Amino acid sequence: MKIVEVRHPLVQHKIGLLRDAALSTKGFRELVTELGTLLAYEATANLDTESHTQPGWAGPVTVQRIAGAKITLVPILRAGLGMLPGVLALIPAARVSVVGLQRDEETLQPVPYFERLTGRLEERDALILDPMLATGGTLIATIDMLKRAGARRIKGIFLVAAPEGLKALEAAHPDVEVYTAAIDDHLNDKGYILPGLGDAGDRIFGTRLE
């Protein structure tokens, strides 16, 4: 399985800022948006292109364009929505598919509650957006859902990932590519990433307990 930990200095600087427990909701949200753009840039570096001839200022010019159907972005509700604006800034024509799975805090297993996918998935690159790859259960369930709908080229973009989640993903879907700003140390006994970011959804939407 292809796993890319993006070591670009800007990415590492921004993920470090996100780890600050005193960071405001506004600051956290802005950094998540910026990291979404930077990580999507890395994740799309191997897209197929094709030649296209168009009018230029001095006559016809041949340029490169992305080949095939438009990319679909797949934010996992709700925290994945925080990454969506940054990725759309880079790929404004992308289609957006939305899935909702929440983790049962007792079993740590994903429970699906929403699915709205774009058509022609078999022709598209699908980029899953989720700030945290923890146990891998939610991600694996999302990939299962996408593959049942016809998706064949799937990548995941995460702010932080746990080794346990990466191992589980590789066992279930070794064909999926992973792009992350950081591979953290481990999961605690509640399935949270350490050192992690805290609850990314609460920090993005300002719903954490004071």
From Swiss-Prot:
Activity regulation text: Allosterically activated by GTP.
Free-text remark on how the cofactor is bound: Binds 1 Mg(2+) ion per subunit. The magnesium is bound as Mg-PRPP.
Pfam families: UPRTase
GO molecular function, one term: uracil phosphoribosyltransferase activity
Positions contributing to uracil binding: 193, 198-200
Cofactor: Mg(2+)
Catalyzed chemical reaction(s): UMP + diphosphate = 5-phospho-alpha-D-ribose 1-diphosphate + uracil
Keyword Manganese: no
CDD domains: PRTases_typeI
Membrane recorded as keyword: no
Keywords: Allosteric enzyme, Glycosyltransferase, GTP-binding, Magnesium, Nucleotide-binding, Transferase
One record GO biological process: UMP salvage
Entry's EC annotation: 2.4.2.9
Pathway(s) annotated for this protein in UniProt: Pyrimidine metabolism; UMP biosynthesis via salvage pathway; UMP from uracil: step 1/1
InterPro entries: PRibTrfase_dom, PRTase-like, Upp_B, UPRTase/APRTase, Ura_phspho_trans
Binding-site list for 5-phospho-alpha-D-ribose 1-diphosphate: 78, 103, 130-138, 199
Protein's job: Catalyzes the conversion of uracil and 5-phospho-alpha-D-ribose 1-diphosphate (PRPP) to UMP and diphosphate.
PANTHER family: ADENINE PHOSPHORIBOSYLTRANSFERASE (PTHR32315), URACIL PHOSPHORIBOSYLTRANSFERASE, CHLOROPLASTIC (PTHR32315:SF4)
Similarity-based family: Belongs to the UPRTase family.
Name of this protein: Uracil phosphoribosyltransferase
Species of the source: Xanthomonas axonopodis pv. citri (strain 306)
Gene that encodes it: upp
